[in-house]
């Protein structure tokens, strides 16, 4: 049903539907009339909905979110006592509304002006307290006046746990005009930050950050259920931090430091101020808050860090400040610095280790260690003093009788040298130790390179000597062969002239190598290894007839003792030839004997036939 006008009066409604306003059939029922009314007959235990455990199966406390049973109970049931109390309050409101103030009638809770003033003061105090506890802490919205422009800028309210001088220098260099330059950037601790950091070194974060015992007890007494899925989504299911106090503390940490940007002129500072003030630094939720520093203001505090140029290996740090953009704030008081974590994960080269400043990552010595060092130094001095003697007596001995004697001082250089070495070793820091080890490693490497060079030169010399030696060996071998031939020619006949000479006339290994080389292709043959074998066996010698004919002297080429030489090939060939001749000769004799036997058999058969014929009777 569309309405012609936006008014709610009866005149604006169509006359055809005017009955809807007065007819009770079209009146919507009230929500409280739909609920089931419960009287006093129902006890508290009967009305009590199902209770759940206070802790989960892991022992963690369950949160206080209202359960489904409680919501259903409030939706469908109501008690008559609560309903009657609500009706009485409605009647009182109506009676108060009917009071005639012109006749001097006043409500029962009327308060005089004097009482109202005193009560208003107390209420204002309580309201301020509650408002102060409930309000969310924010960075100051009303920024002070910028003042006269100067060439020095101050940067405040940033996450100084992650923001470094190099980050600010890179960000501001993008807005430097032509001819402008940023001389340096320094980060100083504020007075507020020094006081708070000094307190945190002893006490840690303020106690307001943590929940009070009353709040914890109230949490423990709560019986409302929470689903197992919600429990896993929440993680620990309960945190010991007060979220508002923690947010306030994290925002206060932004004021622990401030940065000072030194520009070469006022125009550069103005350009940076106009372009960067109020803008977000990357996507970290940190807004640049810039202020002009008046001329002549000096900073006596020692800066946390300084930067005049962008490092070569600069890499921006990816971070976000949870207190500025998240509902769940993270406590960063004991968080490990990001650059230290990155340094622990990286694998540095040797050059980076030498150039690194380890003092930024090493903790300072405590007073106790300094006291121990002082006591050790005193003991060393005392031992050195006691070693000085005069006439075989200690120089500083307590003697009442002073006797004149020739002064003779004895020193112990060995002890002094040892003590000095120990002092040098103790005074050497980590960086010097690394440099010393690197020098030793380089020295060893150079010595090793020298040794390798010497070995290479010696090998070259030895190879040259071997070449000359190989030539001389071949010449010497030829001379030895000639000498052996002469010895054989000049050898006298003696008793053992018929036996084999002790100096053999051939070398089987040389013959085998020569045969192997002959089997290769001509381009791969080594001519110096080929030996001309002039030995020719006498195959017709009757003394060696059985070697070629008797099977007891058969030669098996598959045996490993077989040596395939030219003479051996001739012997095998002769043996095959003779074996084939003997086989053919034997075959002929066998054929002749067979033919003779056949002829003799025929003759005997003829004689037997004639005898049989002669024995037959005549008719």
Curated annotation (Swiss-Prot):
Keyword Cytoplasm: no
GO molecular function, one term: RNA binding
Compositionally biased intervals (Basic and acidic residues): 8-26, 67-82, 92-106, 196-212, 448-461, 469-486, 525-543
Region (Disordered) location: 1-32, 53-151, 196-228, 395-543, 555-619
Domain of life assignment: Eukaryota
A GO cellular component entry from the record: small-subunit processome
Coiled-coil region: 418-476
Main localization of the protein described in the UniProt heading: nucleus
Basic residues bias locations: 438-447, 575-587, 609-619
GO BP term, pick one: rRNA processing
Function: Involved in the 18S rRNA synthesis. Required for the early cleavages at sites A0, A1 and A2.
UniProt-recorded name of the protein: Pre-rRNA-processing protein ESF1
Protein's organism: Eremothecium gossypii (strain ATCC 10895 / CBS 109.51 / FGSC 9923 / NRRL Y-1056)
């Amino acid at each position: 049903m569309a309405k012609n006008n936006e008014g709610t009066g009866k005149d604006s409604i169509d006359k055809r539907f005017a009955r809807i306003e007065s007819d009770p059939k079209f009146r919507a029922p009230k929500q409280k009339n739909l609920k089931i009314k419960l009287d006093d007959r129902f006890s508290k235990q009967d009305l009590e909905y199902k209770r759940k455990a206070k802790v989960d199966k892991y022992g963690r406390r369950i949160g206080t979110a209202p359960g489904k049973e409680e919501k259903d109970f409030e939706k469908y049931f109501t008690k008559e006592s609560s309903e009657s109390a609500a009706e009485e309050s409605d009647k009182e409101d109506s009676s108060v509304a009917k009071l005639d103030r012109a006749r001097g009638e006043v409500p029962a809770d009327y308060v005089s002006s004097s009482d109202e003033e005193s009560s208003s003061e107390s209420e204002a105090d309580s309201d301020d307290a509650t408002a102060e506890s409930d309000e969310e802490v924010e960075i100051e919205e009303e920024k002070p006046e910028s003042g006269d422009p100067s060439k020095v800028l101050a940067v405040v309210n940033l996450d100084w746990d992650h923001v470094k001088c190099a980050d600010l220098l890179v960000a501001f260099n993008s807005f430097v005009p032509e001819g402008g330059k940023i001389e340096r950037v320094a980060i100083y601790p504020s007075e507020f930050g020094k006081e708070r950091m000094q307190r945190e070194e002893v006490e840690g974060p303020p106690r307001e950050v943590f929940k009070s015992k009353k709040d914890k007890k109230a949490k423990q007494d709560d019986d409302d259920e929470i689903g197992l899925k919600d429990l896993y989504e929440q993680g620990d299911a309960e945190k010991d931090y007060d979220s508002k106090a923690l947010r306030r503390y994290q925002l206060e940490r932004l004021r622990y430091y401030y940065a000072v940007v030194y520009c070469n002129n006022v125009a550069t500072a103005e350009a940076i101020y106009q372009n960067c003030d109020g803008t977000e630094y990357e996507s970290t939720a940190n807004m640049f808050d810039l202020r002009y520093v008046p001329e002549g203001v000096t900073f006596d505090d020692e800066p946390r860090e300084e930067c005049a140029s962008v490092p070569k290996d600069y890499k921006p740090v990816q971070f976000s400040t949870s207190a500025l953009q998240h509902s769940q704030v993270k406590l960063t008081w004991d968080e490990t610095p990001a650059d230290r974590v990155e340094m622990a994960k990286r694998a540095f080269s040797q050059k980076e280790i030498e150039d690194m400043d380890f003092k930024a990552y090493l903790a300072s010595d405590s007073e106790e260690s300094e006291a121990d060092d002082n006591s050790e130094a005193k003991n060393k001095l005392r031992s050195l003093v006691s070693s000085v003697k005069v006439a075989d007596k200690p120089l500083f001995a307590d003697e009442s009788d002073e006797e004149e004697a020739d002064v003779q001082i004895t020193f112990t250089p060995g002890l002094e040298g040892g003590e000095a070495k120990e002092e040098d070793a103790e005074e050497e820091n980590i960086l010097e130790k690394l440099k010393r080890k690197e020098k030793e490693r380089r020295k060893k490497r150079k010595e090793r390179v020298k040794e390798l060079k010497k070995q290479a030169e010696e090998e070259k010399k030895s190879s040259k000597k071997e070449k000359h030696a190989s030539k001389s060996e071949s010449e010497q071998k030829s001379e030895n062969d000639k000498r052996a031939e002469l010895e054989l020619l000049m050898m006298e006949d003696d008793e053992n002239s018929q036996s084999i000479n002790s100096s053999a006339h051939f070398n089987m290994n040389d013959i085998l190598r020569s045969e192997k080389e002959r089997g290769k292709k001509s381009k791969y043959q080594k001519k110096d290894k080929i030996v001309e074998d002039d030995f020719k066996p006498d195959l017709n010698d009757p003394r060696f007839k059985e070697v070629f004919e008797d099977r007891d002297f058969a030669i098996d080429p598959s045996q490993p003792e077989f040596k395939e030489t030219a003479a051996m090939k001739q012997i095998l060939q002769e043996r095959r030839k003779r074996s084939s001749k003997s086989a053919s000769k034997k075959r002929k004799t066998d054929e002749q004997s067979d033919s003779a036997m056949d002829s003799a058999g025929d003759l005997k058969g003829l004689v037997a036939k004639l005898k049989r014929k002669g024995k037959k009777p005549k008719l």
